[in-house]
C-alpha cells in the first residue's frame, strides 16, 4: 500500500491506500469525509491537487490536459502510484 497524505481544511491526515483502491474510497474507509458527487470522474466535486508523488486517473473524463498538467486530480477515480500528498477540497481552484 502507498501512504497518501490528504491536506484537508481540518488538518493533514495520512492514510494507506492499496494500489487498486480509489483514493476517495480509501479515505472514506479511514473515516474521512471528503467532498464528492458523481463518483464517476465526470464532475469536479471531488477535485484535489497533487502536491507530491504520482497518481493514475485515466478513468476520469472531466479535467482537460491543462488542469491535469497543473496537478488537479479527481479523487473518486484516482489511484495512487507512489506515496503522495494531495490537497483536498480544490474544486473552486479549478476555475
Swiss-Prot record:
PANTHER family: FERREDOXIN (PTHR43112), FERREDOXIN-2, CHLOROPLASTIC (PTHR43112:SF3)
Functional note: Ferredoxins are iron-sulfur proteins that transfer electrons in a wide variety of metabolic reactions.
Name of the featured protein: Ferredoxin-2
GO biological process, one term: electron transport chain
Record CDD domains: fer2
Cofactor: [2Fe-2S] cluster
Subcellular location: Plastid, Chloroplast
Amino acid at each position: 500500500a502507498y501512504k497518501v497524505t490528504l491536506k484537508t481544511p481540518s488538518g493533514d491526515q495520512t492514510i494507506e491506500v492499496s494500489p487498486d483502491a480509489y483514493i476517495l474510497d480509501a479515505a472514506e474507509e479511514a473515516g474521512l469525509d471528503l467532498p464528492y458527487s458523481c463518483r464517476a470522474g465526470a464532475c469536479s466535486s471531488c477535485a484535489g491537487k497533487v502536491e507530491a508523488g504520482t497518481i493514475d486517473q485515466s478513468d476520469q473524463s472531466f479535467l482537460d490536459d491543462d488542469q491535469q498538467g497543473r496537478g488537479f486530480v479527481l479523487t473518486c477515480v484516482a489511484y495512487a502510484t507512489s506515496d503522495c500528498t494531495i490537497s483536498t477540497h480544490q474544486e473552486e481552484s479549478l476555475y
